[in-house]
UniProtKB/Swiss-Prot annotation:
Protein name as it appears in the record: Large ribosomal subunit protein bL33
PANTHER family: 54S RIBOSOMAL PROTEIN L39, MITOCHONDRIAL (PTHR15238), LARGE RIBOSOMAL SUBUNIT PROTEIN BL33M (PTHR15238:SF1)
Swiss-Prot/TrEMBL GO biological process terms: translation
Coiled-coil ranges (or none): none
Biased composition (Polar residues): 13-24
Record's GO cellular component terms: cytosolic large ribosomal subunit
Keywords from the UniProt entry: Ribonucleoprotein, Ribosomal protein
Thylakoid keyword on record: no
Species: Polynucleobacter necessarius subsp. necessarius (strain STIR1)
One Pfam family in the UniProt entry: Ribosomal_L33
Family: Belongs to the bacterial ribosomal protein bL33 family.
Keyword S-adenosyl-L-methionine attached: no
Length: 55
């Protein structure tokens, strides 16, 4: 079977609340680090989430 090109990543809140989302992305088409605005339920606001390694 072929190896998948998608890798699991963790999106961690830049507001230092400890909240994170997990998702996957295609490393071949998007090699740069992902940064996206998402809702942080801890502070109840939209903040930037930055990609980190999923342990």
């Amino acid at each position: 079977m072929a190896k998948g090109s998608r890798e699991k990543i963790k999106l961690e809140s830049s507001a230092s609340t400890g909240h994170f989302y997990t998702t996957s992305k295609n490393k071949r088409t998007k090699p740069e680090k992902m940064e996206i605005m998402k809702f942080d339920p801890t502070i109840r606001k939209h903040v930037a989430y930055k990609e980190t390694k999923l342990k």
